[in-house]
Amino acid sequence: MEINGVYIEDTFAEAFPIWVSRVLITAATKKWAKIAATEATGFGCSVIMCPAEAGIEKYVPPSKTPDGRPGFIIQICHPKKSELEHQMLERLGQCVLTCPTTAIFDAMGDMADEQLKVGFKLKFFGDGYEKKDELYGRKVYKIPIMGGEFITEAKFGIKKGVAGGNFFIMADTNASALIAAEAAVNAIASVDGVITPFPGGVVASGSKVGASNPKYKFMVATTNHKMCPTLKGVVEDSEIPEDVNGVYEIVIDGVDEESVKEAMKQGILAATRVKGVKKITAGNYGGKLGKYQFNLRELFE
């Protein structure tokens, strides 16, 4: 199969279940809401080494937020429910509560499988001076702070989502591959319910489980040598075509299978429109580890 002249390999992305939270952060200005969202989703690329996977899903205009202020929806994700709650408390408590003019609301809504009492636990920062209230049809806590009051919804919904939807962009140069990756991330941003948790949404250093070198067996993950252009002609199992000199990976987490599949589709379409892109493929473990398999060609049927 070819799309816009780019070969789409007949393969699949292998993805995994993960617990997902969606939090709406609002503030007096878009600038401060973005700062809080950025801080709260830091160090959240992959649970291989990061304490959670996290990212900014989208901007929400004042006309669509509970308090009529600009906001951003973020996702914080973790395979373990208990650890997700811990990460929410740490990230919201340390990175949003501390940020000027912010408030936080549940953004999972009716999609939630369960509720976590994150706001209830955050309210103890108020040292007994906090107040329980109802605002905008939501049960909230008002925590007194130097900047006035910090508003947090009492409970936040979580659900079982999908982590690790992915595809690789192979291009004639590194620059072309990066331009295509940026185009893919921009397209994915229009899809609700998903995040691209790596820096700028792009993975430069794809990894494999463990190590090939027997001296490096202590490593949990090492470079995906099969996908390194500089090892083309060096390693016997290289998967880099002769005309490819740049590769980037896009990884997607989302609230459900359909959201992740739509994000993959839109990202691939955008990437194939960039001059110099030669091939789109995906990463998997032969179907042995992940619950979900997203066939690249089936995305376009």
From Swiss-Prot:
Any one of the GO CC terms: cytoplasm
Main location: cytoplasm
Catalytic activity: N-formylmethanofuran + 5,6,7,8-tetrahydromethanopterin + H(+) = N(5)-formyl-5,6,7,8-tetrahydromethanopterin + methanofuran
Any one GO MF annotation of this record: formylmethanofuran-tetrahydromethanopterin N-formyltransferase activity
Key words, A-Z: Acyltransferase, Cytoplasm, Methanogenesis, One-carbon metabolism, Transferase
Superkingdom, taxonomy of origin: Archaea
Enzyme Commission number(s) of this protein: 2.3.1.101
Enzyme class (EC, first level): transferase
Pathway(s) the chain acts in: One-carbon metabolism; methanogenesis from CO(2); 5,10-methenyl-5,6,7,8-tetrahydromethanopterin from CO(2): step 2/3
Coiled-coil segments on the chain, per record: none
Cellular compartment(s): Cytoplasm
Single GO biological process annotation from the record: one-carbon metabolic process
Function, in words: Catalyzes the reversible transfer of a formyl group from formylmethanofuran (formyl-MFR) to tetrahydromethanopterin (H(4)MPT) to produce 5-formyl tetrahydromethanopterin (5-formyl-H(4)MPT) and methanofuran (MFR).
Protein family (similarity comment): Belongs to the FTR family.
Quaternary data: Homotetramer.
Name this polypeptide is given: Formylmethanofuran--tetrahydromethanopterin formyltransferase
Organism: Methanocaldococcus jannaschii (strain ATCC 43067 / DSM 2661 / JAL-1 / JCM 10045 / NBRC 100440) (Methanococcus jannaschii)
Gene: ftr
